[in-house]
A protein has these predicted regions:
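Membrane-embedded helix-loop-helix hairpins and adjacent transmembrane boundary segments
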Residues: 1-410
Length: 410
C-alpha cells in the first residue's frame, strides 16, 4: 500500500504540478495553486467509489465503461482517452525539455526529443508493477527537492516579508482573486478535478492494488503528499516572481533551480523534477498502451509483451511530437482534460452512483459533450467547455425521465 500510495502521488505531480503550477503562481499568485489542490478534492471523492471499482475485474477505464454501456461506448471512450492523453504525455516531455534546456543550454526541441525517448524506453522496459515500485522513490525525491527549492527561494526573496512587499495584493487573494473568479474555480474543479476522480491513469492505479484497503491507503497517502508539494511549488513560483520578474512564466521553476540553488542542490532538484515528469509520462503511456492492447486489439495475455511494448512505442512517438510542437504545458493539458471530462464525466459518475444511462444516451453524452469541450478549447471559449458538462447533465436528466415513464407504463 505504501508503494502504491507513492505511485499516484508521483503521477499527479508531473510537469503540470511543478513547472505548470509554478508558472500559474508566477502569473497570478496563490490562486494558481488550485491547479494542484483540486487533486485532493477529486481523490477524496474517489474514496467513496473504491468498493464499487474493486469489485470489477477490469484492466482499463474503457473496459469498465464497456461493461456498463456496451462495446461501442467502450471503444468511443477509449478513443477519447487516447486523443486526450497524448497531450498529457506531450506536456511531460515538453516540461523535461524546458528544464534541461535551461540547465544545459541548447534548443528545447532537441531536449524534448531526448527526454521523450528516455521516457518511452523506461516504460517499455517494465510494466505497471515496475512503475509502481519506482514511483515511491520518485515521490520522495519530488517532495524533498521541491521543499529545498522553496526554502532557498523564499530566503533569497526576503522571506514572507519580502514576498508581501514585492508582490501586488492580488497575488495573496485566495480562494478567488481578480484574475481567478469563482466561475473559473468551478470550471477547474470540473475539468481538472474530475480527472482525479474518474481519470484512466488514477483508476489504473486502483485496478493495480491488491484490495480495497490497499487502494484506500494509496489514495490517502497521495492526498497527504500532494498538499505540501502544492505549498512548496507555490512558494517557489512567488519567489521566482520577485527574483526574475521578466522571464516566461513556465521558466520560473527551472530558472530558480539554476540561478538560486548551489550546483549540487540544483542537480538534486533537477533529478527530482525529471522524476516527476517521468512518473506522469510512464503511467499515461501504460494507460494508453493498455487501452490499445486490451480494448482495441483484445490482447489480455500478460505473456505477450511485444504488442503492449509496441503500443508504448507508437503512443510515445506521437506524444513526443505533441510535446515538441505544443504551445505550453498547461494549454495542452487543459485541451486533453476538457475533451475527456466533457465527454465522459457524466456517464462515468452516473454509473458509479448506480444510475447508469441507457447505452444510446451514454454515447450521445460522450460524443456531444466531447465535441462541445473540444470546440470550446479550440475557440478559447470557456463557456462552451462548461456547456459540455451541461450537455451531459441534460442527457442524463432526459434519460431518467424516459426511464421513469417507461417503468410507469410497464
Amino acid at each position: 500500500a505504501i508503494s502504491t500510495g507513492g505511485s499516484p502521488a508521483a503521477t499527479i505531480v508531473g510537469g503540470s504540478g511543478t513547472l505548470g503550477l509554478a508558472g500559474l503562481v508566477f502569473s497570478r499568485g496563490l490562486t494558481g495553486s488550485w491547479w494542484l489542490l483540486v487533486g485532493p478534492v477529486g481523490l477524496f471523492g474517489l474514496l467513496f467509489f473504491l468498493k464499487n471499482l474493486k469489485s470489477r475485474s477490469v484492466y482499463t477505464l474503457p473496459e469498465l465503461i464497456g461493461g456498463w454501456y456496451g462495446p461501442i461506448m467502450g471503444k468511443v471512450s477509449g478513443l477519447l482517452v487516447l486523443i486526450a492523453w497524448l497531450g498529457i504525455v506531450g506536456a511531460q516531455t515538453a516540461a523535461a525539455g524546458r528544464i534541461l534546456s535551461t540547465q544545459f543550454g541548447g534548443q528545447m526541441r532537441y531536449w524534448t526529443l531526448a527526454a521523450g525517448s528516455v521516457f518511452v524506453a523506461y516504460t517499455m522496459s517494465g510494466g505497471q508493477v515496475s512503475v509502481i515500485r519506482t514511483d515511491l522513490l520518485q515521490a520522495l525525491l519530488i517532495t524533498f527537492g521541491l521543499g529545498l527549492c522553496a526554502v532557498v527561494g523564499l530566503q533569497l526573496s526576503g522571506g514572507f516579508a519580502g514576498l508581501s512587499a514585492g508582490l501586488p495584493p492580488r497575488y495573496f487573494a485566495f480562494p478567488v482573486s481578480p484574475d481567478f473568479s469563482g466561475s473559473d474555480l468551478a470550471l477547474m474543479l470540473l475539468v481538472v478535478g474530475s480527472t482525479y476522480l474518474v481519470g484512466p491513469d488514477m483508476l489504473s492505479r486502483v485496478f493495480s492494488t491488491r484490495s480495497e484497503g490497499s487502494a484506500r491507503r494509496a489514495v490517502l497517502i497521495s492526498i497527504c503528499v500532494i498538499i505540501p508539494v502544492a505549498g512548496f511549488v507555490t512558494l517557489a513560483g512567488m519567489s521566482a516572481r520577485i527574483l526574475y520578474p521578466e522571464i516566461a512564466a513556465e521558466a520560473a521553476l527551472p530558472m530558480l533551480v539554476k540561478q538560486a540553488l548551489p550546483s549540487w542542490l540544483g542537480s538534486l532538484t533537477t533529478i527530482a523534477l525529471l522524476s516527476a515528469f517521468l512518473s506522469s509520462a510512464d503511467t499515461t503511456l501504460l494507460t494508453m498502451s493498455a487501452i490499445l492492447t486490451v480494448d482495441f486489439l483484445g490482447k489480455r495475455d500478460s505473456e505477450r509483451l511485444l504488442v503492449p511494448r509496441l503500443s508504448v512505442l507508437g503512443c510515445g512517438a506521437a506524444a513526443v511530437l505533441v510535446g515538441i510542437f505544443s504551445g505550453g504545458i498547461i494549454p495542452s493539458l487543459l485541451l486533453g482534460y476538457s475533451v475527456f471530462a466533457g465527454g465522459l464525466f457524466v456517464p462515468i459518475l452516473a454509473a458509479l452512483l448506480g444510475k447508469p444511462l441507457r447505452s444510446s444516451s451514454a454515447l450521445a453524452a460522450a460524443v456531444l459533450g466531447g465535441l462541445c469541450a473540444l470546440a470550446g478549447k479550440l475557440s478559447g471559449r470557456d463557456l462552451l467547455v462548461a456547456g459540455s458538462f451541461a450537455v451531459g447533465a441534460a442527457v442524463f436528466a432526459a434519460d431518467r425521465v424516459i426511464f421513469l415513464l417507461e417503468r410507469r407504463r410497464s
